[in-house]
């Protein structure tokens, strides 16, 4: 059985790491390079680095921060935010990213997923999906940092991007984001069971059992968290030891 990954997430705006609740109420969590270095030393399997206002503000990619982080960190780095074209993928890979995540731009132009995967390989293309539960009980895709409803069904969109060559899906529950109530396990399992590519569960981790549940009940291949690591509640090493004790295969 493949080992399951723990991925701390750095949401960045204006050059600082921040954390909010349900995509709003952002609170400063520190310097991205320092935080990335800390997670590397704690044994994180990967880091995800999202410029959360690049698309909604129409700003350019923050390449200098990515270069700084990549020069300090020797674990795989996924970078997203403001990716609008295949050329942006190249610029991020050249700056030191190992994988590039796209979200709003993939919804606006699904060919971007196919073209980027064909050119650079599926292994470095991640599609991030921000999902919100509707009153009907299914999940809708939102874009532009969770501000724009698309009317698209999350499970169908996940199947579409996997078919187009996305090597991985980063699935965030907007309802659970920052809530510390645990992953939306029904959402995570619905997407994980519908696609053959790895799914990263995101949104809602408040304790170490939530990480285990994301794998065992949500069928995710990796679990992503921010608050529990940024503010020192747990280290990545503690999370891995807990998961291993619960029978989840992790790299210690």
From Swiss-Prot:
What pathway is this protein said to act in by its record?
Amino-acid biosynthesis; L-histidine biosynthesis; L-histidine from 5-phospho-alpha-D-ribose 1-diphosphate: step 5/9
Q: Which compartments does it reside in?
A: Cytoplasm
Reaction equations catalysed? 5-[(5-phospho-1-deoxy-D-ribulos-1-ylimino)methylamino]-1-(5-phospho-beta-D-ribosyl)imidazole-4-carboxamide + L-glutamine = D-erythro-1-(imidazol-4-yl)glycerol 3-phosphate + 5-amino-1-(5-phospho-beta-D-ribosyl)imidazole-4-carboxamide + L-glutamate + H(+)
Q: Supply the InterPro entries for this chain.
A: Aldolase_TIM, His_biosynth, HisF, IGPS_HisA/HisF, RibuloseP-bd_barrel
Main location per the UniProt record: cytoplasm
Any one GO CC term of the record: cytoplasm
Name the residues annotated as catalytic in the UniProt entry.
11, 130
Task: Show which residues constitute the signal peptide.
Answer: none
- What GO biological process terms does the UniProt entry carry, in alphabetical order? L-histidine biosynthetic process
Q: What enzyme class is recorded for this protein? A: lyase
Source organism, top-level taxon = Bacteria
Family matches, as SUPFAM superfamilies: Ribulose-phoshate binding barrel (SSF51366)
Alphabetically list the UniProt keywords: Amino-acid biosynthesis, Cytoplasm, Histidine biosynthesis, Lyase
| EC number, as in UniProt | 4.3.2.10
Molecular function as annotated in GO: imidazoleglycerol-phosphate synthase activity; lyase activity
Describe the subunit structure: Heterodimer of HisH and HisF.
What is the annotated role of this protein in its UniProt record? IGPS catalyzes the conversion of PRFAR and glutamine to IGP, AICAR and glutamate. The HisF subunit catalyzes the cyclization activity that produces IGP and AICAR from PRFAR using the ammonia provided by the HisH subunit.
**Name listed for the protein in its UniProt record:** Imidazole glycerol phosphate synthase subunit HisF
What organism does the record attribute this protein to?
A: Polynucleobacter asymbioticus (strain DSM 18221 / CIP 109841 / QLW-P1DMWA-1) (Polynucleobacter necessarius subsp. asymbioticus)
């Amino acid at each position: 059985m493949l080992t399951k990954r723990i991925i701390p997430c750095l949401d960045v705006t204006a050059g600082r790491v921040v954390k909010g609740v349900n995509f709003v109420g952002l609170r400063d969590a520190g310097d991205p390079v320092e935080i990335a270095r800390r997670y590397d030393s704690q044994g994180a399997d990967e880091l995800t680095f999202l410029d959360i206002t690049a698309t909604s503000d129409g700003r350019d990619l923050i390449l200098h921060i990515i270069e700084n982080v990549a020069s300090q960190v020797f674990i795989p780095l996924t970078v997203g935010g403001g990716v609008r074209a295949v050329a942006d993928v190249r610029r991020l890979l050249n700056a030191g990213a190992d994988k590039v995540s796209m979200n709003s731009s993939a919804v606006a132009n699904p060919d971007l997923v196919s073209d980027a995967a064909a050119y650079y390989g599926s292994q470095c293309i991640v599609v991030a999906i921000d999902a919100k539960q509707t009153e009907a009980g299914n999940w809708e895709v939102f874009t532009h940092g969770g501000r724009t409803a698309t009317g698209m069904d999350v499970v169908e969109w996940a199947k579409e991007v996997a078919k187009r060559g996305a090597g991985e899906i980063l699935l965030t529950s907007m309802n659970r984001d920052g809530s510390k109530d645990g992953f939306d396990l029904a959402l995570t399992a619905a997407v994980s069971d519908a696609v053959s590519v790895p799914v990263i569960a995101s949104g809602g981790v408040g304790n170490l059992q939530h990480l285990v549940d994301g794998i065992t009940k949500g069928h995710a291949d990796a679990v992503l968290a921010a608050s529990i690591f940024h503010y020192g509640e747990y280290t990545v090493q503690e999370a891995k030891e807990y998961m291993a004790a619960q029978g989840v295969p992790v790299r210690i």
